[in-house]
């Protein structure tokens, strides 16, 4: 038996810079990953000729054709091996923090090492699972452009940043948010011009998330979450993470961060967590 960790994905900003010939949106974002907030994946090989996948603690129902099952089917074809997988969902489902992508990426990392699968093939499988999965496969601070396939690693400092994550118990489809963005906006953002250089944490956070209005239109509760975080003492930055509905809060002191955590838990039935990232 083996247990893997699949950390949450955090977008410090998310710019939509255009669309490609196939109509897919092009993004410009920096991804970071939480040190202390993750799904847990328990893997047990089986002599059976089929996989079993069990989810524990999922905030929403997860269909049979999910990111974990897709990776397992790839491993079945590649290595002719089957597994019983139990996934402890500490991250909310369809929440904009890459839970499904992170789960798939953690499995790909493990099976890639176990069966000496080439990096090129792993990358192809990751992109076939989801646009965030490739960045989650590396699970290191990175500048992501294109459809998620262009990744430049950022030098990770020893600085650790505490953040507040708040998710209303309301799943949001990334596809629906991008569709809504396409229907309501025709002007795209300029690229951030990071070019892989290390930038200050605050500078990156000052850049917007272009999906915010589109996400709020689908899930108005996001606006309530953003306002609630912003109204907490010592709040410096409040923004949507990914396509939502999870929102990020950054505070001037750890004490104010902890107070905000306690206050939001006391007044709302939301998923509220303190996590730490490096950049």
Swiss-Prot record:
Q: What is this protein called?
A: 4-diphosphocytidyl-2-C-methyl-D-erythritol kinase
Family per record: Belongs to the GHMP kinase family. IspE subfamily.
Q: What does this protein do?
A: Catalyzes the phosphorylation of the position 2 hydroxy group of 4-diphosphocytidyl-2C-methyl-D-erythritol.
Q: Does the keyword Transferase apply?
A: yes
Query: Which residues take part in binding ATP?
Result: 92-102
Q: Write down the EC number.
A: 2.7.1.148
Q: Which residue ranges does UniProt annotate as crossing the membrane?
A: none
Q: Which UniProt keywords apply?
A: ATP-binding, Isoprene biosynthesis, Kinase, Nucleotide-binding, Transferase
Q: Does the keyword Transferase apply?
A: yes
The EC category is: transferase
Q: Which GO terms describe its biological process?
A: isopentenyl diphosphate biosynthetic process, methylerythritol 4-phosphate pathway; terpenoid biosynthetic process
Q: Which residues form a coiled coil?
A: none
Q: Which organism is it from?
A: Neorickettsia sennetsu (strain ATCC VR-367 / Miyayama) (Ehrlichia sennetsu)
